[in-house]
Amino acid sequence: MKSLWNNFKVAFAMFSKIPMPCADWTKENMKYMFCFFPFIGTVIGGLTMLVAYLGLRFGYQPGFVTAVLVLVPVFVTGGIHVDGLLDTSDALSSWQERSRRLEILKDSHAGAFAVITAAVYFIAWYGVYSQLFNSAENMRAIGILSLGFMVSRCLSGIGVITFPKAKADGTVAEFSRNSSDVLSRNVLIVYLVLLAAGMILIRPVWGSLAFVGALLIFWYYHHIAMKYFGGTTGDISGFFLCICEVGMALILAVVSNF
């Protein structure tokens, strides 16, 4: 039981800014880390629902509530996945050979394409929440999206565990070596099944389309990782997580209008 608690602490310490008690980053304490990774999405989803509910309940201006909703994931995670999105965008846009792309991922400087990607990413989120935060009925769509923050992390964890690694000495490779691959993968698959059921239960068509969209983006992630990098890395995993979430959000923004 203590080992599971330590794995929980390591997962939250690594992938969020939520204060956690100290835990040694040993192999035993990282073995089941990915089993707890999706629960960071639970926190983001819960806060998203809370902000949306309070915004409707107390009549705050839609623009203000929308801005807060956009920033919730950044506040919870510290932007760790957005960093991966921007680094990967720079690498993909360079059109260099594979080894050079991997070097760009490690470069701490933001290129022009990273800046453009950041602007597009946050504007897309603002547009989505502007569309969704316009009626109590659309709280169902926000509810589906809140579960989507867990779906993206389940798929991201499965990718880290099962995809080839682009670098043998990277963070993802280290996490994968220390994790219990089969058990963690199976737990994440069970989570996915339950989350898909929950999304469909809230609103069958909306939930189904959002979940299928996430799976298609996961396929695209695998394609990009293998074709351009020879495997996945922490940055590419963050890239996937960001486009998966905003992709589900865009789908919900469109279908909720019908």
Predicted regions and their residues:
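Transmembrane helix-loop junctions in multipass membrane proteins, especially transporters and channels
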Residues: C22, R57-Q61, N134-A136, I161-D169, ...
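Alpha-helical membrane-inserting segments
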Residues: L47, V51-G55, V72, V76, ...
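Solvent-exposed interhelical
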Residues: C154-I189, Y228-F229
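Membrane-embedded alpha-helical segments that form the functional core of polytopic membrane enzymes
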Residues: C35-S89, I142-G148, W206-K227
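Selected alpha-helical membrane-embedding segments in polytopic membrane proteins
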Residues: F75, G79, L105, V120-I161, ...
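Multi-pass membrane catalytic core of lipid/isoprenoid biosynthesis enzymes
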Residues: M30-G46, A91-S135, I144-L145, V182-M199, ...
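Acidic (Asp/Glu-rich) catalytic motifs at the cytosolic membrane interface
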Residues: V72-A110, H222-C244
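Membrane-proximal soluble regions of multi-pass membrane proteins
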Residues: M1-T26, P164
